[in-house]
A protein has these predicted regions:
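A general structural signal marking secondary-structure boundaries and capping sites
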Residues: 69, 140-143, 162, 166-169
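A hydrophobic/aromatic-rich effector-binding and dimerization subdomain
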Residues: 2-19, 76-138, 164-168
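All-alpha amphipathic helical-bundle segments outside canonical DNA-binding/catalytic cores
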Residues: 124, 140-156
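Polybasic "coupling" helices that flank or enter modular domains
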Residues: 153-158, 168-170
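Generic protein-terminus/edge-of-domain signal
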Residues: 1-64, 71, 101-107, 113-117
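Short beta-strand His + acidic residue motifs that chelate non-heme Fe in jelly-roll/DSBH
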Residues: 49-51, 67, 73-80, 96
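Residues immediately flanking
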Residues: 45, 69, 90-92
Length: 170
């Protein structure tokens, strides 16, 4: 990575996870960087490539990129069309404490070990992701009792779905 210039740490996570649903035409392009937390990127529309540890991935709608903490990456955004994506920053320690037997963050470690960070869901998996995201976004807008617990549970369900999509180690 030295040939790419300096690599910086970006973003801070002060909660268990942070969910972004973004749509714009500018797309904030950054130089190579890493985070202290795990990150998932789900492309909904637009054109973007991600370089992760010197491997370039062309994202298609409904593909998911798993980026483990300390992994160097950069987005290359085509700014000629709207870029809609979901980005989730995750505190792996929280999820490990919440459900240690579920190993919810293993999908990031398996993707990192295999060097295959891009998940391409089949039709059934895509429907499950769509339903999970819709339920999570509805829960985000819900002010009633238990809404926070519902959001946490739905985020865990999304991590379970992603874990099912990552191929098992040989």
């Amino acid at each position: 990575m030295e040939s790419e210039g300096s690599v910086s740490r970006e973003g801070y996570l002060k909660e268990n996870y942070h969910y972004f649903h973004l749509k714009d035409t500018a797309g904030q392009e950054r130089d190579f960087h890493f985070h202290e937390f795990d990150k998932l990127v789900l492309l909904l529309s637009g054109r973007v490539d991600y370089v992760v540890e010197n491997v370039s991935y062309e994202l298609e709608p409904w593909t998911v990129l798993l980026i483990k903490h300390h992994t160097i990456h950069k987005a290359l955004i085509d700014k000629t069309e709207p870029y809609e994506r979901i980005i989730v920053y995750l505190d792996g320690k929280y999820f490990e404490r919440a459900m240690p037997e579920a190993r919810l963050m293993d999908c990031f470690a398996r993707a990192d070990r295999s060097g295959r960070h891009l998940l391409v869901p089949d039709k059934r998996q895509r429907r499950e992701l769509e339903a999970g995201i819709q339920a999570f976004e509805q829960a985000m807008a819900d002010p009633r009792f238990g809404a926070r617990a519902m959001r946490d549970t739905l985020m865990m369900q999304l991590l379970i779905l992603l874990g099912m999509m990552v191929p098992a180690a040989p």
